[in-house]
Structures are given as structure tokens and as C-alpha cells.
Amino acid sequence: MSKKPKYKTALIGTGRIGFTLGFDRKREQPASHTMALRKNRRIKFVAACDNNQLRLDHFRRFVKKTITFADCSNMFATDKFDIIVIAVNENSHLDVTLDAIRAKPKLIILEKPVALCVADALKIQEEAEKYKIPILVNHERRFAQDYKIAKKYIDSIGELISVNARLDSGLRVYTPSEENSGAYSLLHDGTHLVDIVSYLLEEENDLSDLESKILYNMKLNNIVFDKEKSDVVRFVSASFESLKCPNVNINISGKSKFFGFEIDVIGTLGRIRIGNGIFEFYKREESKLYSGFYSLEKDLKVKRPKKTKYFSNMVKNAVDFLDGKAELKSNLQTGINTLRILEDIKNQLKNELL
């Protein structure tokens, strides 16, 4: 049997998601691109780039066999890579991704969100199609075992009545002054919330149609502005429809004193609650409280996975794709669809600020 090839890989960005989250002892590991790449035996991690010398020095002390660069163009000029991973800040996605596409790797892994705005994302798409470069977008929950279980279980809870998704943090939801940086939660973490709701509601073969947003007919329900800064949004609630569910609610708080991420899916025969630290599945059973009624009871047959493998499964999907064994589970088009939904919300917020 011939030996399977290793894919030569380069990383751009050695910050939190690129590198340092791999040292967070409370997080499920691997939690960074560096750790996930190093864990996969089919990856040959040969180069890394960062324009911050302190970060690069820290990275070099840990990953000693990887050649480091302060400039992407120099890195691209020295070698030909199978995979290029882009883990830079949102405001650098467009330029860095265009440069990476022109370096002609076999695959690009791009951190979420695709770009600051849909217009930038479409420029990336146009260049990717020109050079025929596939792009995997790291909306990590699409690769997580717990969400895979939830997606499969949805078919057993009957007709969907409602989906309520919530993100809580202390980061502003939106302000026009940060639009060029992406430093607001609607984009930064809201992309995870909207994307995973889309994942749960989309069909398995629904990944190819760019114009097909899973959520549509948006209505803004409530907005709360900062008490001192009138151009800062601290809370937004928006409702949507989808083919699978007529009532989808997205709530994002930027005034919470904690970080929370959860989704509550209610059907005619059951319920799913899933999120950070949450894994609950309910099914319809004869009621223990009332004669002639049914209640929802926890489905004890559904076991929480010991590890979700969200990051390692993402890298595995990249390898399987290059091997010709699998399609990308989170591609450029699903990423753009998510960005379109976020932009719908953002544009409504901008109208309210006028």
C-alpha cells in the first residue's frame, strides 16, 4: 500500500486563534490552528507568518521546526504550499486572502467571518473562482460532534415551532465607528450564532447556492442603545423565517457581564437546547403530572460526547477534501450566506442610527 501524502501547510497569523488559545487549559484542545495542524499526521506544518515580532518570537520558541516570516510575500516566494491557513484580524482578511489565492495553494482555510462585509467577500469569491482555489471557512461548530448530534436529532422532534438563539457578552453589538475594524459582536461572535442556526436548519445538500440564505424575511424586534454613547448598540433582537421553521429569533447582547452562547429548538414532539456548556435533548412522553397529557422528558439515550473535536475535525475535513474523500463542510458560499444575514441586521441598525 502506498504511503499517504502529507500536505505542506503555512499559517498566517500567530495570535489567539492562530496559536495562543492552544495554551488555554480550560478550553477543549486543540483550540488553535497551530495545535490542530500539529496534531494531524497528514499535515506537514512548514511555515508561519506574522507582522508582530513579539508574537512571532513566542511562536518560534514553541514550534521550532517551522520557518517564520514577517511578510507573506516573502513566505509565498520561498515555497509552494498545499494549504494556507489565514488567522488574521477581520480587517486584514480581504488583502491577505487575495494574496494567498494568488499563491495558488490546493486549499485555503479562512477564519470566520469571511470578510468585514459582503462586498469584500464577493471580491474574495471572484478571485477564488478565477484561480480555482477552494476555501474552507472555519465556522467551527459545523465540525463539532455535539452539534452534529443536534442536527441529526432535529428530525425526531416533529414540525419545528421556534428557534431561539442567544449570544451574551460585554462587547458592543454594533457601532459605525468600528465598522472598518470588525470589533463588534454582531460580526465577531454573531457570525458563529447565525452560521450554526443556518447549519441546523439547512439540508445536507444545501451548501452550494450562494443566493440561498437559510434565514429570510428579517424583522427587527428590539434595539437597546448605550446609555452614554448613542451610536453604540448594546442589544438587538431580530426575527426571521426559514423553510424548516417559521419563527427564528436571534438575540445578541453587548451589555452582559458574562459570555453565553445557546440555541433552543422547539418542535411539536421535542426540544433541543445546545450551546456553550449546554447539551439537553427532550422527547414527548406520557405525562407524569397529568392524566391524558404528554410532557417533555430528557432523552437519556443521547450522550454528550467527551470531546466535540471541533478544531481537529475541521483540519480532518480539509485533509479528506484534498484526498478526494469529502466535500468541504463549511465553504466560502455558506460563509457568504452567513455574512449576508449579518449584513441585513447591520443595515437595519444603521437605518435606526440615522
Indicate where each model-derived feature is located.
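A contiguous active-site-proximal alpha/beta segment in oxidoreductase catalytic domains
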Residues: 115-176
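Rossmann-like dinucleotide-binding domain that binds NAD(P)(H)
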Residues: 173-258, 333
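Short active-site oxyanion
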Residues: 43-47, 82-84, 184
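Beta-loop-alpha module in the N-terminal Rossmann-like domain of NAD(P)-dependent dehydrogenases
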Residues: 54, 63-127
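NAD(P)-dinucleotide binding in Rossmann-like oxidoreductases
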Residues: 243-314
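C-terminal helix-rich "cap/oligomerization" subdomain common to oxidoreductases
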Residues: 1-6, 83-85, 316-354
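N-terminal Rossmann-like dinucleotide-binding module
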Residues: 1-62
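Acidic-histidine catalytic/liganding microenvironments
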Residues: 40, 63, 78-79, 144, ...
